[in-house]
């Protein structure tokens, strides 16, 4: 067989180029598939979140109970609540049970004044703050207390998903006084914190376990935060 030597350089160059292309492709895939490594520790991330949340003027929140409920003053068993929080108060809508009756209640708190709807008639009236079942509710303090008291913080196994950091830990039940009122003081429920990986704003809190005396061990409270620094203002009911 005759070998044409003038073909060898071309064949060699082609093979070399092909090898480089394959190598670059593999290298690119390796970079893309490399797991994300957090640049801060869980404790640092929680501290950064606390600072970020302190700088907010307002946000929206929602409280749900995949398991259980929260007992408020007046034997009100709250199952769901949501509203807006500003620097001078909040507006909350809640769904609850009184005995076997299902009721909806709305309350507006502006500075030192509180208005609330009658659970049976839906009519608004101004009430003394201490007479409101939401008298202990302070979402701003709640967020600060949870972020300030999270213990044994650790990243979830897949801690960064869709630009979120998920931190697991425990909190003293007394930390939740600003939302549940009466607490089982010695209890230490589990907590999961979902943070935005860029801004460190707190997006979701999942509290699992006993926080109130009436709670079961499988009680789950989920607090979702959103609409950070949206343009909102609180107004008294008309």
What feature does the model see in each segment?
Residues 64-70, 97-101, 112-121, 210-214, ...:
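Hydrophobic lipid-interacting interfaces of membrane-associated proteins
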Residues 84-142:
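An acidic-aromatic
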């Amino acid at each position: 067989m005759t070998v044409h030597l003038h073909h060898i350089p071309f064949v060699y160059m082609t093979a070399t180029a092909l090898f480089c292309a394959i190598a670059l492709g593999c290298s690119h895939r390796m970079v893309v598939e490399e797991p994300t490594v957090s640049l801060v520790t869980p404790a640092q991330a929680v501290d950064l979140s606390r600072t970020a949340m302190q700088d907010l003027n307002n946000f929206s929140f929602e409280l749900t109970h995949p398991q259980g409920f929260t007992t408020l003053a007046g034997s009100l068993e709250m199952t769901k609540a949501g509203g807006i929080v500003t620097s001078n108060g909040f507006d909350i809508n809640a769904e609850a049970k009184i005995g076997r009756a299902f009721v909806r209640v709305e309350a507006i708190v502006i500075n030192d004044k509180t208005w609330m709807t009658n659970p049976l008639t839906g009519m608004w009236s101004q009430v003394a703050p201490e007479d409101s079942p939401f008298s202990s509710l302070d979402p701003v303090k709640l967020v600060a207390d949870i972020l300030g008291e999270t213990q044994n913080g650790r990243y979830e196994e897949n801690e960064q998903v869709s630009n979120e950091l998920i931190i697991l830990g425990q909190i003293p039940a007394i930390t939740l006084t600003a939302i549940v009122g009466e607490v089982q003081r010695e209890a230490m429920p589990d907590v999961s914190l979902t943070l935005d990986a860029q801004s460190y704003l707190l997006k979701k809190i999942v509290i699992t376990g006993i926080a109130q005396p009436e709670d079961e061990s499988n009680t789950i409270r989920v607090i979702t935060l959103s609409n950070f620094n949206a343009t909102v203002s609180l107004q008294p009911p008309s």
